[in-house]
Structures are given as structure tokens and as C-alpha cells.
UniProtKB/Swiss-Prot annotation:
Keyword Ribonucleoprotein in record: no
Recorded GO MF terms: magnesium ion binding; phosphoenolpyruvate carboxylase activity
HAMAP family with a match to the protein in the record: PEPcase_type2
Name this polypeptide is given: Phosphoenolpyruvate carboxylase
Gene symbol of the encoding locus: ppcA
Keywords linked to the UniProt accession: Carbon dioxide fixation, Lyase, Magnesium
NCBIfam families referenced in this protein's UniProt entry, alphabetically: PEPCase_arch
High-level lineage: Archaea, Methanobacteriati, Methanobacteriota, Methanomada group, Methanopyri
Similarity comment: family membership: Belongs to the PEPCase type 2 family.
The keyword Magnesium is assigned to this record: yes
InterPro entries assigned: PEP_COase_arc-type (IPR007566), Pyrv/PenolPyrv_kinase-like_dom (IPR015813)
Annotated GO biological process: carbon fixation; oxaloacetate metabolic process; tricarboxylic acid cycle
Amino acid sequence: MEKVREARIARTLATQHPDATKFVRVQEEPEEAVECLVELGAEEYMVDFEGKLTPYLQPIQVLMELYDAGVRVGEERFVIVRVPSATKENVLRQVQALLGVMEANSELLKEDPDARGIFEVVHPMTSSPEELVETVDRISYARRFASRELDVPLKAGNLRIIPLIEEVPELLDIRNILTGYVEGMREIGMDVSYLRVFIGRSDPALSYGHLPAVLACKLAIFEVYELSDELGVPMAPILGGGCLPFRGHIRPGMEEEFVEEYAGTATYTVQSGFRYDHDREKAVASIRRINELAANDPLQLSGDDIEYLVLATAIFMKHYLSVFFRCIGTLNIVADMIPNTRDRLARKGPVGYARDIPEPDRVGAQCKDLGDVGRELYRELRRMRVEKLPELPRAIKFTGACYTVGMPPELIGTGRGLAEIEERLGEDALDAVISRLYPMLREDLQFAVEYTFLETAGSVLPSSGVAMVNTDLEYCVEYLDLEPPSDFEYQNLVHTLEPYLRYVVSEGGVEEVNPFVRDLLLEMGRMRGSLG
């Protein structure tokens, strides 16, 4: 890969996601950064303010812990910070986080005047180029303020943005978002000499489905490389995913597979479940292997491939949402039972926030110029738009909830989608999806089937939704030749939980989960290799 900045690009990024069964307090995270970068071999660590109760001083604590451990941040090991979204949370929280980064760099410079420190921040939930340019403007403002009022050197405020794009409509529109950002920066006299682009794999699956998330991420990676050539700006994709297939299937022992599946990715996240819910030696060896594997060329997509991809995304999404809209109220209740393993903002309340509701019509708009099938899908998806839903859970808790009731989310909409693609687009399109666009489909679905117990799901969730997933399962077995589940120990835990799940759902939720049930939920997470 072409060199895109003064320092090299990290291959592995350790994050603070709450997808492990181990609880990590915010006070422990500075030591965790040292463990990740020194002991586990990850090349980058992300301090996370987005949706999290991270203290203002954590960037300072992280940099100083690493300095004391002999790590020169910004050379061979790196720290980035995910700041809050000004639109989804508020401007004040974003500016506070930016000032925290600048103050951290200032403290590090006192110890090491040549240190680079933190020089990149992640902008979450990016939906427009204007958001990015406005955040750059806030960085400039915060930099001047910190210099004038806090005696922070201007050098400490040299921060670049990494846009995080994490919904299917935005991933399909990534070309316009990134082009608008680069051109907007040039209009205000600021050049973008390189750009790392964070592609979310987890949240688009929550809102739009497993297959739509996979396909949209593939297209986004391809478009990043195409735009890099067109705009003359070196770009490097980061793929943000977790251990379970619904969230990316980035797990120890599968390095060769996911590096090939998401070809072109420069940096892979190794989230908490990767590090804590697998054998430590295996996790270390896996991180080492990812670091060794060179970034390969992205999947090349022809015009026909892109058309198949967009239409298939719409078809799978339609079938996913037909279940999601029926079951999300009940799944929310189960999701609230999943233990918290980081100090997060609440989903509800004055300082909490929830994900936006799905917007199928926006995906449909991408189809309307793609022939008769595209126009029909556009009309179908417009009719599916809803104005109000219960507040959505986080993707990790949603995934954990689906596995807990015996209905892994990877199955939802997949089988019916495959059947409709064959019927409406033909065998060539079906073969493109299964063989070229998503080679790991069978392996990912076989993993999910090991935890599938739809009888239990049917006793907890609305029967109409579970019946659709049963049809999905039948088609998946037919198209992908899947084997029945063989993990009877896990099945016994699902059956043990079933009466309690029915009780909690009938009550509309509980204030406090039974400690025995909490232990069962954590044990189930350990068995599948991640809480959610």
C-alpha cells in the first residue's frame, strides 16, 4: 500500500467495545492500553468518548501510562480517540473530548518534546461531509482556545479526522460523503494529504441486516480505493467489527479468512471479545498474524457486480426488516438483560442516546434507476418506512439478545433473500452473492446455526417473526447445505433460561436481572466467543 502519512498505518486497532464477558472499568482502561500495545501486540488503541462515560482526563492517563512503559506514541504504536458526535450527542461533549486530547498531547510534550502523541480523532456516525468540515472548524477553534487559555502548544492541537461511516445508506453513499469532505476542505484552503476511513460493520447490521452490512462494507472499501485515485488523496480503510459473524467475524484463528473476505482493509479492530473471550495465547498469535499479513488489493467490482450488490442489499434488507419491525420491542426487553461490561451511557435518559431508526426508503432510492426490479424495490421499500420505533438497543446487546433467545441475527432475512434473488435477478446474481461477493457466507451461517433454537425463540418472540426466520433457516439449509447444531451444552443453557425469558417479557422488563441468570448470560457469551 502507498504510504499515506508520515507514520505507517497500524494493522490492528484495540478498542473499548463492551462485547466481552469481562467487565473493564474506565479506571482500568489506561492500564488496558499498555496491555494491548505492549503485551498483546496490537499496534493502535482507541480511547472512546462516544456513548461512554469516559473521563475527560483519560487521554492524559493513557499517554502517560504508555510513556512510563517506554512506548513512544505516534511512531510504532498509536493512540486515536473517538469523540462524540455533535449531532447525536452534543457539541459540548465533542469539544470537551477534543480539548482533552490536546491537553494530553501537551502533557506528553513536557516529558518528550519530540513526541507525536495523538494526531487523529474518529468522527462517529458520519452522515454528511458538512459534519466533518464543521468538526474540523471546531478543532481549529479548540486549538486556539487551548493555546490562549490553557497554555497548550499549538502543536498539541494538530488533529486530523477519521470519518466513521456506519449505516447502510451512508455506506452506499460513501463516494458523495468523502468527495464532499475533500472538496469542502479545499474550499476553505485546507488540503487533505491523506485520509483514513473507518467503515463500521456492526451498526449497519443492527439497523439493516447481516447481508446488507456485509455487501455495503464491500462496496465502501472498493469506493475508497476508487476515490483515492480520482481525488489524488491516499486513503486507508479501517474495518470495525466484532467476533460474531453478525458483527464481522473478526476472531482469533480466522485471520486468513477475514483478511481475504474484507480485502483492501488496512486496519482491523480487535475488540474486547477478541482479547478477553478467547485463549490469551491464541489471541496474541492472531494479532501477530494480522500484523504480518500485508493489506491485499480490494475486491474488484464491475458495473454488473455493483448493480447486483445494491439490488441484493435492498432485497435482504426488506426481509430482515420484516422480522425486525415485529420483534424489536421484545428483543429490546431481552437486550436490557445483557450485562454491561463497560461504563456506557444509558440507552434512555437525559444523557443517553439511541441509534436512528432504519430508513429503507433511502436504500430504495439507490435502486430506482436499476431497471424494472430496482423500480419495484424502490416502491416496496418506500412502503416499509416507519416514523417511530422503540429506542434501538446497541448492536452488541441486540446481537447478544438474539443469541440468548435462540435466534441468531445472521439468519434473519437471509434465506428468503437468497430465494428472492434467484427468482428476480437470476442464478448469475445468486452465484455472485454466494461465490464472489461473500465467500464466507456458508461458514458464517454455519456458525450461527450452532446456536439456533427457534422453538425457544417462538416461546419468547412474536410468532409471526419467528415463522419468517424458520423459513429463512429452511432456505439457508437448501442453498448452503448447512448442518444441524451440535452444541448441546449451549442448547441446555438456552432451555434453562426459557421460563425466565418468558416471565421477563410478560412483565415488560425487570429492574434487576437475577444473579444466576446474569451468570448464565455471561457463560453463554464465553461459549460463543463474545457477549454480542
